[in-house]
Amino acid sequence: MSISTSTLGYPRIGKNREVKKALESFWQQKISADELLKIVREIEEASWQTQTKAGIERIGIGDATLYDQILDWSFRFGIIPKRFQQFQNLECYFAMARGKDGILALEMTKWFDTNYHYLVPEITPDITPKADFSDFLETVKRAKKIIGKSAVPIIISPITFIRLSRLESVEFDNILAQLLPLYSDLLTKLKKLGISEIQLHEPALVFGDSSNLKKQFEMAYAELAKVGLNIHLVTYFDDLGETYPWVMKLPVTSISLDLTRGQNLELIKSYGFPADKTLGAGVVDARNIWRIRTQEVTSLLEELKGIIPNISVQPSASLQFVPYDVRREVKLPEALRNVLSFAEQKLEETVLLSKALTGKSNKSEIENIEIYWQEFYKFSPANEKVKSQIKALKETDFRRSMSYLERLDNQIKLPAFPTTTIGSFPQTKQVRKLRARYKKGELTQAEYLAQIDANIAYCIGLQEGMGMDVLVHGEFERSDMVEYFGEQLDGYTFTTHGWVQSYGSRYVRPPIIFGDIYRPHAMTIREFEVAQSLTEKPVKGMLTGPVTMLNWSYPRTDISRQEQAFQLALAIREELKDLEKAGAAFIQVDEPAMREGLPLKQQRWHEYLNWAVDAFRLSTAIARPETQVHTHMCYSEFGDIMESIKQLDADVISIEDSRSNNETLMQLTDADYPAQVGPGVYDVHSPSIPTTEYLRESLYKCIQYLPVTQIWVNPDCGLKTRRWEEAIPATRNMVQAAISLRQE
């Protein structure tokens, strides 16, 4: 019998967002590459020491990144598309991430069903993988020096890497054959450094179609096993499904399973677990922020102990999806804080559970956790009115009063290629400082609102001057599209230091749903009315949809996600009604996170999509026929959920298509999407400024797929992260491109 502890990755942004600040300073040429790397390494080394101090025995290392871990492996393998090969070193790396001088960046998409985004490798016939592992080997050497034998290198497996790549005129098997010798070479070098075990992260195994690659998995692992290192095969986010029986036979020494999601426990009971392997028992949920329920988890571990002799207790995945330390959240009510668990607390829970399994735990620690939960349930807000409203919902509450074509006749007529933006305009340091000063009490409400209104006036004047057709107020009062609404809803709370990485230098603070959700007052009406009073042109009301609010929050675990989504939908529904009363003829209900909530296995999609679509419709069905309802979705693959997208019954959908080579546009066309579409004609995540000619070409491509009457012209996402000197010429060129096409 062997009981141990492991980790599979750790937050890498710095407790005070040091990496973000360093990246932005480097991009602005305020610090050197050496200074940037020094800061990132200090954060990385601090995380190793934190895990060591907590008592973790085998610590996953090598997951720290300047931007994205998949981009790192693309770079190490020399999988660099031709358009970036003119650049060298970090200039090339960041050009791939962000674009440069008009060159499109790599496509960005969701990391499985999380809110993290990775950069999609592009593998084309002209690319021959050629490895340079020097940075990774340097990391391993540092880790060995600091934490010794506890260091276990984390490597993205070749099959997951290829599975997540875009293959253009190349065969999966051919690329695998080219990559495997490079992987074997890396493992050989690690062995020479004295490494005895590696983690090979294989999340692609949880996809429902992974059995189609059974031969490739078996061949790859047989080849890598020849090196003679202990291979710890790591899966997460779902169960192995039908792959379980043959995965258990792969030549590895450990297999990690996520026991917080899916049916892995049932698979173990049905098929057993090989006695010659260690089970990495992912029992501490790496993706939520709630403390363990000790009785449930210890019972699960005791059950596993009766089946499997060698167990490593660990988080279910990398801890990059949770903040660092809940003890810093001194503003949260104690009853709530006591049942929250961030990365450092999850390390403590991992060690506590390991001790409980060996009979060495402190009984009072376990009892205290249960007492905390009892106190929390007394504190958590309940709203009987909301519960009653949900019980009383009727079919008509989910349906607009007219069909799309009937509504179209009632709505404001606009010129061909109508122009708009997705909502936000640049959030400068001055704007962020303004909100911070107001929160600290350094400004009165009147002083704060006067400055917000000045920003709105500037934004409206700017758009009018460009000739934009449907304006937005700019969202200067909003630090985040979820946080802004959550702060005004009962049942939500927010952290002060709870930052997690969304992509690159973009960090977010997901709110926490801890009780029933209710809208006590209007949330967006004042700013809308200010903006609309400044122009004769229509201004869009801007709301975040219920499914995105849910998927970008840490949800409750005591009631279903569906019920939480419906509570949110009722709140958004009331806000939409108030926007109409204030004169809004265009209202956007953003759902960028609709697809990311999908279960990873397709057979479970139907249930999720049913209630997700219903939640959106519940929030928008109350709109009058003359109100044009827009929605926005980004970083999503729509082809396989197109019927659900159509069922949303939005009048206009704007999408992220600028990095996707018109794939999403083709999918909409193939599905005979009936409503209007804003394809997203340029990439806002790149600092490059698109020319009018480039944007004209983008629109010409759109015309190949959609009739002119269906096309809107907009950027692919909000402009919040751009600077004014980037946003102004880009949007002006966009409007000019649309106007020039009208004149043809």
Curated annotation (Swiss-Prot):
Keywords attached to this entry: Amino-acid biosynthesis, Metal-binding, Methionine biosynthesis, Methyltransferase, Repeat, Transferase, Zinc
Leading EC class: transferase
Record pathway: Amino-acid biosynthesis; L-methionine biosynthesis via de novo pathway; L-methionine from L-homocysteine (MetE route): step 1/1
Residues engaged in binding 5-methyltetrahydropteroyltri-L-glutamate: R17, E18, V19, K20, K110, W552, E596
Enzyme Commission no: 2.1.1.14
Listed Pfam families: Meth_synt_1 (PF08267), Meth_synt_2 (PF01717)
NCBIfam families: met_syn_B12ind (TIGR01371), PRK05222.1 (NF003556)
Protein family according to the UniProt entry: Belongs to the vitamin-B12 independent methionine synthase family.
Name of the protein in its database record: 5-methyltetrahydropteroyltriglutamate--homocysteine methyltransferase
The organism of origin for this protein: Trichodesmium erythraeum (strain IMS101)
Lineage, broadest ranks: Bacteria, Bacillati, Cyanobacteriota, Cyanophyceae, Oscillatoriophycideae
Gene name for this UniProt entry: metE
